[in-house]
């Protein structure tokens, strides 16, 4: 005890200057410091206290209680005081160097943590306030002291005080005399012990100390407390008596709740004296067994409310005094403190007892640190029996080392709470925690992960804890890949709250979270999305493209909820970054690389899942774009987004708007029928009865009556039309939901849907309607989902009519034009300037114009009020004029032009038909026809005929002008031929005077001779307007291409087809054949000339008179055109030929035999094959759908054979067998087998298709070639086809069976034997066994696998790039697999689209490489930029959309 006192005196002397708090017990550390002060106190072995303290210091001792409370309850103030470091573990720390808020345990929820924090803060504030008030109260008490209004005690009686306080006195007198004694002792100065010997004996008498009357015991305690004050620093009693005295003191301290209000002043003064002189510092010395029970009793009486605040403060002071005096902290005391520390109310909120204990330990944290280290060793030590098995004692609550078993179970909670108090508390346990993190038991790993996640999430200590043991932090981060989902969830919660000043550590955590984007559990993937969003919004510069890649990929997740969260999260992130850094153009390169692709990613999802489409629209409309009332800003942001969209995503966005348009049209048609079923349901147009004969009028009336008698059938048609455009909803059929919508009970919702479908409804009104409808569809029924889908699909959200005003303003601003003056229309011809027209736009075509063009193709009616503004742009550069003409051509039906503006527009369009650009001239002519037809024609009121004399005169003048330019040898040949071709196609009569001139020009001067006419070299348009070919042509080739197109239009538009017309067609074929011998043109020019001729002939063959006259050789030439390959990969001209062929066939303008041309494209690149498969599938499905709706008698008719897709197989086999390389392909026939396999794959889907093709092959084996009767090539090809058919479909186990088609081989191509007219199935099987013409040891070459039912091509051999693409996809999917500790953790969360809440058969997934090709159509090599401008013009004119080619009328 002496050594301990010496150390204490020395340390107090060191810290006295800093704290200004004198201590009663001073410890000695070294001998030199003993001589520094005469006030050093030592405790002798016999327990006496020595002191030289002056009486002047008594006031300081009395203030110590108040100062102590202020230090404990106001740690923020004590932090400002400089303190010296204390190295002696037993030395108590009067003040705390760091102040930390009370934190709940690891088991509390975030809301509970918040409540706990607030409760702790409120308690601290209350205690701080109370501390100051208690200080002032104590000062007053010190000055006045307690007076009992009694006569002073007679001092002489002290000598015989034992007799004076004899047991014969009544309780009232005893109390009265004790009060007098207390008052006397209060006035007695410290150290004046004269006459108190007998008093001491009396006070320790059991009749007073153990009296049943509380007031007697209280007054005895008051007197004893004053005795201790007077005798300080010596002890007035020996150890035996002290036990009795301390028993009385502890009993009185714990009776605070029972003290009467009248006695509270005496009670509080007693506690104050005990606190000031720190009597309870002797408790451990007097009786250590009383220590833990006293702590337990005090802690159990803590209330934590305002009413009991003084007592809570007193308990805190007493317990602090005891802790400061301890040489070592017993295990039982740690048990009690820690049990109180982790005590929680229901819901996990810390109790007032836990908060009190937290503050108690925090105040003495530095002193308790070493003692806790020793306790921690026992706490973490596992209990082992002699046999090596874990001890399990059910009969005892304590373990071998005295630690509570409950504490051992909650060691992780203890570690976290102690870490909150002082991080150094848990440093000795870090190694054990690292072992626990790698334990086999998942619950142990989870417990360690929880406590460390809480610790590392502490902002003030995370960096220090990481640096303390880096290996522990690395092991902890590895738990992101734990097998147990609960542990991975804990780690995700940690990453959400993790904060650090180190960017490196933050990046490590983000990478770990990124790996969880491919977690097997959707909830963890959702959590990873939320965490990324939080970090990005907080600091976007933390991101890099590598981290963002998986984040963006979540919009393609297989789980619908994950996709939904990803779409909303990405939209929120993009908006946050834009609000912080401004428009995308102002972003840094890093931000652009990371976040500019977000709109692209969202738009790309429009092509994946049906249930995501309207969510993407909501994300755009409500998050990416500003508020609906700010239309100007919405327009600017939309332009900004559209600028950074890839070309493929722009097309996807356009396609989605077209889907919305289709649904809106069908929905409004249904509504119109409901309003007026007689007009709409009858589907008849009113006609004049005077112009119809009586019989026809009667028939029409009967038809209308029949239709009106069946309104239900009519409405079913409209419902079906709407249903065809809806996805599938879970629980109900979409058709039933449409019927439910049109019931009277849903009339309000229906009216709102009609209103939101109106193009004039503003964005704000649309938003209000959406809110109104969605508020009525809060449940999760199918009808609610259907209503939500409809309200978003029918609305003109994202972009609509309101945007046009600001888009046109922005376009005028970009072009530097003056503001539009509606009251002062301009004369376009006067404003037109050729220099301005020929001048290219400096920065290319503005994105504003591109958006306007896209909108005109989808919503042509939104331009109705802006016609005068649009035509004003026709005086700008040719790069601007071309898209403006497209807009006018798309929206001409809805534009409202004044008469003066219309006349000026027609004059301007005629002027543009003579510009040097053929594409622009042709578009100007077609636009002129659209505007001029209603303006220059009228209906005669007398006979009802159309009077188009004005239009004919105008067109004749145009034709005369064009031929005059030819005579004058104008350098505008290409445009003149283009416009003449348009005139010849639709209005051949206006060229009647110039037919001979045209024949001479086309046949004699251009096609078969040398043309002396020339054209201007500067004819190209801006590259962003036209997708021209990246080729180089000679001038003669360019002229011939223009002539071929003009000739095809001329032949198509002729009223009467004569022998001369057929000769012109044959001349084109001869020119086609002669190209192979031509030495003037290079290989590319020859190939492209052939393709142009094929396109022209396909256009001509729409007239059946031409098509019927072609020979088998000519048919072969047409089909072989699709097999032409050039050095250009994916030649756009080949694609255009395929698209032209598909167009005329789907419109049934060419017979099915031309399907053979699709099969001859088998050797083309993969992108071309995909296009072929797409168009051929569309044609075949259309034909089969028509056949399925025909009556059985009609479908079996012989004249319908040519309508079946399978009827093209004989023609295709003929083309394959007459290839020049067919015989050279022997004996393996690899190329021939490739062609046959590809075409068979296109046609065969089911068993009946298989049987039809099988029958055709067997019949062909018995036929003879009509051209070369000795040739057996077609039989060899048929045998190849049979082997392919058997090999590729052997898993289907199909066999030849009866089919609904009569096989008729074309007589021009094959000679048919009479015995084949009625061949049975047995005959077909027999014909297979005929002697084969294939080599004896022939083996079928390796062939690509067939496509599946979803039309997904599994071709592995068609193109080498396909294998590369699949390998890259596999590498990308498996990129992060090796980072995980478990096998089931990473299971391809990005899957092929499947059905979700709203589901339909998924769209075909495009490979990454193919998507990349679609996204970069503008990339061109610099080596070929020097091509002639005229070449670009001709090729671009060929690529323009030919929707107007359907106008074949005269």
UniProtKB/Swiss-Prot annotation:
GO terms for cellular component: chromatin; nucleus. Residues 45-59, 1430-1450 have a biased composition (Acidic residues). It holds the Pfam family PDS5. InterPro entries: ARM-like (IPR011989), ARM-type_fold (IPR016024), Pds5 (IPR039776). It is found in: Nucleus. Residues 1369-1378 have a biased composition (Basic and acidic residues). Residues 1402-1427 have a biased composition (Basic residues). Keywords: Cell cycle, Cell division, Coiled coil, Mitosis, Nucleus. Residues 650-716 form a coiled coil. It comes from the Eukaryota. Residues 1-145, 680-707, 1340-1450 are annotated as: Disordered. Residues 682-691 have a biased composition (Polar residues). Residues 77-138, 692-707, 1350-1363, 1387-1401 have a biased composition (Low complexity). Belongs to the PDS5 family. May regulate sister chromatid cohesion during mitosis and couple it to DNA replication. PANTHER family: ANDROGEN INDUCED INHIBITOR OF PROLIFERATION AS3 / PDS5-RELATED (PTHR12663), PRECOCIOUS DISSOCIATION OF SISTERS 5, ISOFORM A (PTHR12663:SF0). This is Sister chromatid cohesion protein PDS5 homolog. It comes from Dictyostelium discoideum. The lineage of its organism: Eukaryota, Amoebozoa, Evosea, Eumycetozoa, Dictyostelia.
């Amino acid at each position: 005890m002496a050594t301990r006192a010496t150390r204490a005196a020395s340390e107090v002397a060191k810290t006295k200057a800093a704290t200004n708090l004198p201590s009663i017990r001073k410890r000695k550390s070294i001998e030199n410091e003993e001589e520094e002060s005469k006030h050093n106190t030592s405790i002798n072995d016999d327990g006496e206290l020595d002191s030289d303290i002056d009486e002047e210091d008594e006031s300081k001792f009395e203030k110590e209680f108040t100062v102590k409370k202020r230090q404990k309850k106001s740690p923020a103030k004590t932090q400002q005081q400089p303190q010296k470091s204390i190295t002696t573990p037993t030395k108590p720390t009067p003040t705390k160097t760091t102040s930390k808020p009370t934190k709940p345990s690891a088991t509390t929820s975030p809301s509970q943590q918040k409540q706990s924090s607030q409760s702790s803060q409120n308690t601290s504030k209350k205690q701080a306030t109370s501390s100051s008030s208690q200080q002032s109260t104590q000062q007053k008490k010190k000055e006045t002291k307690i007076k009992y209004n009694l006569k002073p005690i007679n001092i002489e009686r002290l000598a015989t005080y034992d007799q004076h306080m004899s047991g014969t006195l009544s309780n009232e007198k005893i109390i009265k005399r004790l009060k007098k004694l207390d008052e006397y002792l209060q006035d007695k100065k410290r150290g004046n012990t004269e006459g108190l010997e007998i008093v001491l004996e009396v006070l320790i008498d059991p009749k007073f100390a153990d009296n049943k009357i509380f007031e007697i015991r209280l007054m005895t305690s008051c007197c004893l407390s004053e005795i201790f004050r007077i005798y300080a620093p010596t002890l007035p009693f020996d150890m035996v008596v002290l036990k009795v005295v301390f028993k009385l003191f502890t009993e009185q301290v714990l009776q605070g709740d029972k003290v009467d209000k009248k006695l509270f002043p005496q009670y509080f003064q007693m506690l104050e004296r005990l606190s000031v002189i720190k009597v309870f510092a002797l408790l451990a010395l007097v009786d250590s067994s009383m220590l833990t029970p006293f702590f337990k009793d005090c802690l159990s009486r803590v209330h934590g409310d305002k009413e009991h605040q003084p007592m809570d403060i007193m308990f805190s002071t007493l317990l602090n005094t005891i802790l400061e005096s301890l040489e070592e902290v017993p295990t039982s005391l740690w048990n009690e403190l820690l049990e109180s520390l982790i005590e929680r109310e229901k819901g996990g909120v810390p109790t007032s007892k836990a908060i009190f204990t937290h503050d108690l330990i925090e105040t003495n944290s530095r002193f308790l640190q070493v003692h806790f280290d020793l306790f921690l060793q026992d706490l973490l030590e596992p209990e082992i029996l002699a046999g090596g098995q874990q001890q399990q004692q059910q009969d005892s609550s304590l373990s071998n080392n005295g630690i509570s078993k409950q504490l051992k179970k909650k060691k992780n909670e203890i570690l976290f709470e102690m870490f909150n108090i002082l991080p150094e508390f848990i440093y000795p346990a870090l190694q054990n925690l690292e072992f626990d993190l790698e334990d086999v038991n998942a619950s142990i790993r989870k417990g360690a992960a929880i406590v460390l996640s809480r610790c590392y999430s502490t902002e003030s200590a995370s960096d220090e804890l990481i640096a303390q043991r880096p290996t522990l932090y690395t092991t902890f981060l590895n738990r992101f890949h734990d097998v147990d989902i609960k542990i991975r969830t804990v780690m995700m919660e940690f990453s959400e709250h993790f904060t650090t000043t180190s960017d490196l550590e933050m990046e490590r955590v983000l990478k770990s979270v990124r790996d969880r984007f491919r977690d097997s559990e959707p909830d963890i993937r959702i959590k990873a999305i939320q965490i990324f969003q939080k970090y990005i919004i907080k600091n976007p510069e933390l991101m890099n493209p590598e981290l963002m890649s998986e984040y963006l990929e979540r919009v393609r997740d297989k789980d619908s909820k994950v996709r939904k969260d990803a779409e909303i999260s990405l939209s929120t992130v993009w908006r946050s970054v834009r609000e912080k850094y401004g428009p995308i153009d102002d972003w840094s390169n890093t931000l652009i690389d990371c976040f500019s692709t977000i709109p692209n990613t969202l738009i790309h999802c429009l092509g994946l899942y049906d249930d995501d489409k309207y969510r993407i629209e909501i994300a755009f409309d409500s998050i990416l774009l500003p508020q609906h009332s700010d239309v100007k800003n919405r327009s600017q942001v939309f332009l900004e987004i559209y600028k950074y969209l890839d070309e493929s995503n722009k097309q996807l966005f356009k396609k989605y708007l077209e889907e919305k348009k289709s649904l809106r049209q069908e929905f409004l048609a249904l509504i119109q029928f409901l309003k007026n079923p007689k007009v709409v349901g009858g589907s008849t147009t009113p006609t004049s009865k005077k112009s119809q004969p009586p019989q026809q009028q009667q028939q029409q009336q009967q038809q209308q009556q029949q239709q009106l008698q069946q309104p239900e059938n009519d409405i079913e048609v409209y419902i079906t039309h709407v249903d065809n455009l809806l996805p599938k909803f879970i629980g109900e059929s979409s058709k039933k939901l449409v019927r439910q919508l049109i019931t009277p009970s849903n009339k309000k919702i229906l009216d709102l849907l009609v209103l939101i479908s109106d193009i004039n409804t503003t964005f704000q009104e649309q938003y209000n309607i959406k809110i109104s409808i969605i508020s009525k569809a809060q449940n999760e029924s199918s009808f609610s989902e259907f209503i939500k889908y409809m309200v978003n699909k029918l609305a003109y959200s994202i972009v609509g009519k309101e945007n046009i005003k600001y888009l046109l303003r922005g376009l005028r601003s970009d072009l530097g034009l003056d503001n539009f003056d509606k009251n002062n229309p301009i004369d376009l011809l006067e404003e037109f300037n050729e220099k301005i027209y020929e001048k290219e736009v400096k920065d290319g075509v503005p994105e504003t114009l591109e958006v306007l063009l896209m909108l005109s193709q989808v919503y042509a009616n939104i331009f109705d009020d802006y016609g005068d503004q649009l035509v004003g742009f026709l005086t700008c550069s040719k790069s601007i004029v071309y898209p403006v003409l497209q807009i006018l051509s798309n929206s001409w039906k809805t534009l409202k032009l004044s008469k003066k503006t219309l006349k000026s527009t027609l004059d301007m369009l005629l002027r543009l038909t003579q510009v040097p650009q053929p594409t622009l001239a042709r578009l100007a002519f077609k636009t002129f026809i659209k505007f001029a037809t209603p303006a220059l024609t009228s209906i005669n009121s007398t006979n009802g005929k159309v009077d188009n004399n004005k239009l004919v005169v105008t067109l004749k003048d145009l034709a005369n002008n064009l031929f005059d330019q030819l005579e004058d040898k104008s350098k505008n040949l290409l445009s003149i031929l283009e416009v003449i071709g348009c005139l010849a196609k639709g209005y051949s009569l206006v060229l009647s005077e110039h037919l001979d001139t045209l024949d001479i020009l086309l046949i004699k001067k251009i096609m078969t001779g040398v043309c002396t006419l020339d054209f201007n070299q500067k004819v190209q348009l801006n590259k962003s307007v036209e997708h021209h070919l990246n080729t180089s042509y000679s001038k003669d080739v360019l002229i011939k291409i223009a002539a071929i197109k003009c000739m095809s239009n001329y032949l198509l538009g002729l009223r009467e087809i004569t022998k001369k017309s057929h000769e012109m067609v044959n001349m084109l074929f001869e020119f086609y054949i002669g190209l192979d011998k031509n030495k003037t043109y290079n290989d590319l020019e020859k190939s492209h000339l052939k393709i142009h001729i094929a396109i022209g002939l396909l256009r001509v063959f729409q007239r059946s008179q031409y098509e019927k006259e072609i020979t088998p050789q000519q048919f072969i030439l047409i089909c072989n055109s699709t097999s032409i390959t050039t050095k250009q990969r994916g030649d756009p001209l080949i694609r255009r030929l395929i698209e032209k062929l598909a167009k005329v066939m789907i419109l049934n303008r060419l017979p099915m035999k031309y399907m053979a041309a699709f099969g001859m494209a088998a050797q083309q690149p993969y992108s071309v094959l995909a296009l072929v498969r797409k168009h051929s599938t569309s044609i075949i499905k259309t034909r089969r759908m028509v056949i399925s709706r025909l009556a059985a008698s009609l479908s079996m008719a012989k004249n319908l054979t040519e309508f079946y897709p399978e009827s093209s197989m004989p023609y295709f086999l003929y083309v394959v067998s007459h290839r020049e390389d067919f015989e050279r392909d022997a004996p393996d026939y690899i190329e021939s087998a490739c062609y046959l396999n590809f075409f068979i794959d296109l046609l065969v889907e089911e068993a009946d298709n298989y049987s039809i093709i099988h029958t055709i092959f067997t019949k062909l084996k018995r036929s003879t070639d009509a051209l070369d009767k000795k040739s057996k090539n077609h039989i060899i090809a048929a045998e190849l086809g049979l082997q392919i058919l058997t090999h590729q479909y052997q898993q289907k186990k199909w066999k030849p069976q009866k089919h609904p088609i009569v096989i008729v081989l074309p007589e021009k191509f094959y000679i048919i034997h009479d015995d084949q007219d009625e061949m049975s199935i047995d005959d077909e099987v027999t014909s297979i066994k005929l002697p084969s013409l294939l080599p004896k040891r022939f083996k079928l070459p390796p062939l690509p696998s067939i496509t599946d039912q979803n039309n997904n091509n599994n071709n592995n051999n068609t193109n080498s790039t396909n294998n590369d693409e699949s390998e890259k996809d596999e590498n990308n999917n498996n990129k992060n697999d090796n980072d995980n500790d478990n096998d089931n953790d990473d299971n391809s969360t990005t899957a092929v689209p499947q059905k979700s809440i709203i589901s339909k058969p998924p769209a075909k997934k495009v490979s990454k490489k193919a998507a990349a090709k679609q996204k970069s159509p503008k990339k061109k090599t610099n080596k070929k930029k020097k091509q002639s401008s005229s070449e670009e013009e001709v090729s671009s004119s060929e690529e323009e959309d030919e929707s107007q080619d359907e106008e074949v009328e005269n």
